[in-house]
């Protein structure tokens, strides 16, 4: 745990009236916890959870087709990020050491086959405060990740291939 005993990790106090809204989902070998208020979802991911896979699973479980990922913070490891070059090809870079996730945003849509699809950009700070930012390909939670999602109840977004680039573009129904 990066030098911290697990019991030292602070847990956030929740007002009693909101505590009843918290849902704990046991999906196999891990527990994902979230709370929902209208269109807003706040999710907590725990050590070992991969961010993309967890958010896709949440979209499938809750059954939404369109959402904005408005913010995310935490501490992650085994990060793979990058950028799209001028030829439309992604260049990937690893950031394997535990790092602070200082900003995360993106969206959740569906593919043409109906699978949940996440598109996320983020910014990390390593332990020397060097910034690493770009398109997130993979990221595993090291301590915790707290992510806000705004579900667009009456919208539908579909990811479709774009010509000549390594990207699935958004189409709106």
Where are these regions (language model features)?
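N-terminal intrinsically disordered, cationic/polar leader segments
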Residues: 11-118, 123-132, 136-173
């Amino acid at each position: 745990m990066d030098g911290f005993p697990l019991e030292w990790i602070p847990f956030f106090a929740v007002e009693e009236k909101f505590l009843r809204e918290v849902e704990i989902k046991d999906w196999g070998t891990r527990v994902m916890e979230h709370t929902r208020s209208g269109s807003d979802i706040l999710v907590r991911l725990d050590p070992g959870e991969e961010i993309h896979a967890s958010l896709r699973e949440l979209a499938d479980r809750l059954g939404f087709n369109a959402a904005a990922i408005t913010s995310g913070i935490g501490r992650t490891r085994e990060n793979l990020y990058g950028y799209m070059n001028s030829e439309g090809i992604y260049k990937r870079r690893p950031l394997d050491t535990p790092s602070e996730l200082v900003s995360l945003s993106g969206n959740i849509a569906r593919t043409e086959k109906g699978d949940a699809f996440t598109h996320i950009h983020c910014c990390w700070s390593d332990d020397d405060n060097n910034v690493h930012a770009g398109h997130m390909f993979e990221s595993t939670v090291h301590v915790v990740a707290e992510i806000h999602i705004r579900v667009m109840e009456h919208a539908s977004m579909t990811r479709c291939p774009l010509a000549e680039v390594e990207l699935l573009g958004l189409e709106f129904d």
